[in-house]
Amino acid sequence: GYIQIIHGMEEHKERYEAFAEQLWQAGFTVVTSDMRGHGEHAPKLGFFKEKDGDRYLLSDQVQITAYIRERFQTEKVMIFAHSMGTIIARNLLCTQSHSYAKVVLSGFPNYPGTQIIRIGFFLTNLLTRARGPMYHSKLVQQLSVGNFNKQVKHAKTEADWICSDEQVVQAYLKDPYCGHGFSVSAFHDLYMLTT
């Protein structure tokens, strides 16, 4: 089978190398990519597009699926998506469900609620007009992901929520392509995908 991996927020495809290797050993062909604003080739980490970045994130994955189908002459593409990747996968399924044989959603984020999303839209729109779409707001970052660590008892770092394995957390913290934050326009795009 053929598996398309869609990674999570503020990380990159290389974090999935060991997992992809296990899938390959099990007989799967795996295609990974960095989402816009992620990974070593991103022009600006945490930034997708000045406008409609959400649409581009979806379009990119549709193009990757088309590439897999054409390159490997298959109709049976499976998705493995993690965290923010599951939000993208869920959106793809709303319009492209016929394109995927199976979908695995790992670490699907909790919906923050309509009120939080409305506040997020208000803040990101205001800050985009005042500071520009590439501006990074500590307030928006805190409102969007700041509570993730509250579920971890005796947290030692701000990223303990990502994994119970301390070595994985330390590797994440040391990785220059992880935990870089999102621009206000990227958070706006994320809210668009969540609604």
Question: Which functions belong to the PLM regions below?
Answer:
Residues 50-70:
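Alpha/beta-hydrolase active-site loop
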